[in-house]
Amino acid sequence: MRRGLALESLIHGAGHENGIRAGTENTPYIVGLGQAAHLAANGLDESAVGMARLRDRLEKQLCEAIPGLKVNGGSVDRLPNTLSVSFPKVAARDILARLPELCASTGSACHSTGQVESATLAAMGKGIDHVAGTIRLSCGWYTSQDEVDRVAGLLIDAWENLSG
């Protein structure tokens, strides 16, 4: 911390550390966080491989069923758990509106509202129709193959119904 920098306390109370921190640290939570970080680090490589396999499975199913579907960043290194695809001729928000059971985002992570053109997708040379059709999907540590297959089916059905 730079000398003379005035920081406002986030939690008010006791005046620990010159009034910046209130109360006593929660030692059990700190130890728990350390243990969680240790467990996560031990399984990270294996988890990344598993999530990439699920991401690729979802990508393959969507690409095989939807003509003109575009994978954003598919030819470069990308996160093992994230798939960004652009659905042709249909706005992503319309697809997601039909799928309340699905948690996904439109556009890129930089503009999750989908209300403005994503600078990330624009920098990749993507046009407004491409951006409007983009959905970002993520797998988690506990995502199953059955869940991926179900999501693929839901997305394909929604796109088919909307694209007419």
Q: PLM ranges: what are they?
A:
Residues 83-135:
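Conserved C-terminal alpha-helix-loop-beta "cap" of PLP-dependent enzymes
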Residues 7, 20, 73-74, 105-108, ...:
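Thr-Gly-centered strand-to-loop micro-motif
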Residues 65, 72-82, 95-101:
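Active-site pocket-lining segment
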Residues 37-60, 70-79:
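Structural signature of PLP-dependent enzymes
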Residues 1-44, 48:
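Conserved core segment of the aminotransferase class I/II
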Residues 27-30, 37, 55, 59, ...:
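A general structural signal for well-ordered alpha-helical segments in protein cores
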Residues 29, 118-164:
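PLP-dependent enzyme catalytic core of the Aspartate aminotransferase-like
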Residues 22, 29, 47, 84-85, ...:
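Glycine- and other small-residue-rich loops at beta-strand/loop junctions that grip anionic moieties
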